[in-house]
A protein has these predicted regions:
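Active-site cofactor/cluster-binding pocket
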Residues: 3-198
């Protein structure tokens, strides 16, 4: 699928230029997470293009979402140019690291820093990539909503200084676009992830 939307409702206070990769497997809410960031950017008046690839319809299959915010025409993020990688599955982090530019940001749902292969750790260091690992699954389980790990990881990511979005803007979008029956638990997961890092 290709998403092309132009922010026309507001004139942005400042230009946002960001290329994001969101990666996971079917059933983890990768596409909903992508919507959170794209809807936030649009609400702030920015242009957005994006594309989702791979096994979206197959539960458990790889899902990779490309999202570019700013003056872009092509929706795909080329290898070595991405600013942010959000990996909702640690194995997908391995598969998608090459999308990040030197000095990029990687936030991974994983069991702890020790899961990185030594060779990958060397790659991260050599390329100046800021890598953060967060047990979002555990946080989601602790609040009784295992399917909300995506929101917990986003909350955590918003506490990282390099993340090019404001906490208040993302939270407002979650509140606005989440169906009413899931709104409370989604905000709870997001807030739990954000607080864990503060």
């Amino acid at each position: 699928m290709r998403l092309v939307q132009r922010g026309v409702s507001l004139k942005p206070e400042s230009e946002l230029d960001a290329k994001l990769i969101l990666a996971g497997v079917g059933g983890q809410g990768v596409l909903f997470a992508t919507s959170i960031f794209s809807e936030t950017a649009l609400a702030l008046g920015h242009d957005v293009v994006g594309s989702e690839t791979h096994g979206m319809s197959q539960r458990g299959g790889s899902v990779i979402s490309h999202l570019k915010i700013g003056a872009y025409e092509s929706p795909m993020v080329r290898h070595g140019t991405g600013d942010v990688l959000l990996a909702f599955d640690w194995q997908e982090a391995y598969r998608t690291l090459a999308f990040l530019r030197r000095g990029g940001l990687c936030v991974v749902n994983g069991p702890g820093e020790g899961f990185w292969d030594p060779g990958v750790k060397g790659y991260l260091t050599a390329n100046g990539i800021a890598a953060h690992v967060y047990a979002a699954d555990d946080v989601a389980m602790s609040i009784g909503s295992p399917r909300s790990a995506n929101l917990a990881l986003i909350g955590y990511a918003l506490s990282v200084p390099e993340m090019p979005f404001a906490h208040a803007d993302i939270r407002a979008t979650i509140e606005r676009i989440t169906p009413s029956k899931f709104r409370e638990v989604n905000l709870k997961a997001f807030d739990a992830g954000y607080r864990r890092q503060r």
